[in-house]
Amino acid sequence: MTQLDRSVAPAIRQLEHFSILQPELHRMKNGMPLYVLSAGNEDVIRFDLLVRSGQLDQSQPLQAVFTNRMLREGTVRMTSGEIAERLDYYGAWLDLSSSVNCGFVTLYTLTKHLDRTMEIVAGLVKESVFPEEQFRIICDINRQQFLVNNQRVDVLARKQLNRSLFGTSHPLGRYAELEDYERIQVEALKDFYHRHYHSGNCSMYVSGKVTPEVVRCIERHWGEAPWGNCTAEKVERTWDIVKDARKRVHVEKEDALQSSLRMGGFSLDRKHPDYLKLRVLVTLFGGYFGSRLMSNIREDKGYTYGIGAGLVSYPGTSLLVVSTEAANEYMESVITEVYHEMDRLRQDKVPAEELEMVRNYMLGDMCRSYEGAFSLSDAWIFIETAGLKPDFFDASLAAIREVTSDELLSLAQRYFCKENLIEVVAGKKPSGSCKSKKTIFERN
């Protein structure tokens, strides 16, 4: 028996081949698209209904997310208790969520119970009644969660950064406040439901061990005839971005034990030709444990337990965001070091060894992200909601493999603009030497 030499690191092998299973499109009789991803050997199915309307389509805060959340609270045939009991009996799990531009209904179920569980889920979407009593309970629960979250400095900093970048009249900069939980009425949810939850505004994904009978079952419940208010027209809306002129904004939280930092500015849209290679640069800068920010600010200086940078994408734009939490006395030093690492990438080429390490990390991350049938659903739902072409994953792979140190230097010089970043610090008001900074304070 050969003994393993643990003093020698295992050899790193190049990823020779990587491909993502393409979904097969089935067009239902009522025109709804069903994307089938047949993979896996277990008799378990994941079903996703994607509603192409979200927070960008609402007329007031909380309307989209509460409409989605209330689907499981009662239909014309079942109460919320009966819905929960039936799903539990069949061993199914239901998840409801809402994003900037979409709502999601996700069901995990055993294949042998698919017909029964699909009947329940179809009833939730097609026959919701939005009972007033359940609505008030949901409001109270979410109001309490809002109050708890509003004590967290990371939440305060994240919200303020979007307010500063987009403006409070833009839906991406407008967050629900305490009074919005009092103002929202069930009639607003019914209005959103009738305008957006219909067969002409939805698509479906099914993954797992998908058989022809699974497809027929889905068509029976969803695709035989149009459902909902299919005559409702979706109004495309636009908003002006009103960026805060201030460089530094401080959100005061007097009892905070530490401060939260968010630095951010507008960056490239996912469809920009430089976007995929910029992702490599941002990963190297602050997107993994061995990044420049982690190596300097965590490992070398010890200012924080963790710091990261990433591209946060929204419809039509994205943000370059740096985030961390640290003791109040270290915050100025952290900001200084962030800019220092940006300058290094703008001035010096990335060493070949470091670039190779980032390549291997990103390629490995892609393999982990898309190795299972259910994660493939996430991948292709992402493609639809982001409005990307099906070759996005192949293009991502090519960008990671082909980007050079010269290209990264050029990208840093063009897109790492310190002047465009807004600094948001949530925590105690700084004292001493920090007061010399021209910092404007926002009281939470």
Kindly label every feature range from the protein language model.
Residues 1-8, 27, 82-233, 250, ...:
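Charge-rich, well-structured scaffold segments of protease-associated domains
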Residues 2-45:
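N- or domain-start disorder-to-order transition segments that initiate the globular core
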Residues 19-20, 88, 245:
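Residues that act as N-cap/strand-start positions at coil-to-secondary-structure junctions
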Residues 32-53, 60-61, 201, 229-291:
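His/Glu-based metal-binding/catalytic segments typifying zinc-dependent metallopeptidases
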Residues 55-57, 71:
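N-terminal cap/recognition module
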Residues 62-73:
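Active-site SXXK
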Residues 294-295:
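Phosphate-proximal small/polar/acidic motifs at interfaces that engage nucleotide phosphates
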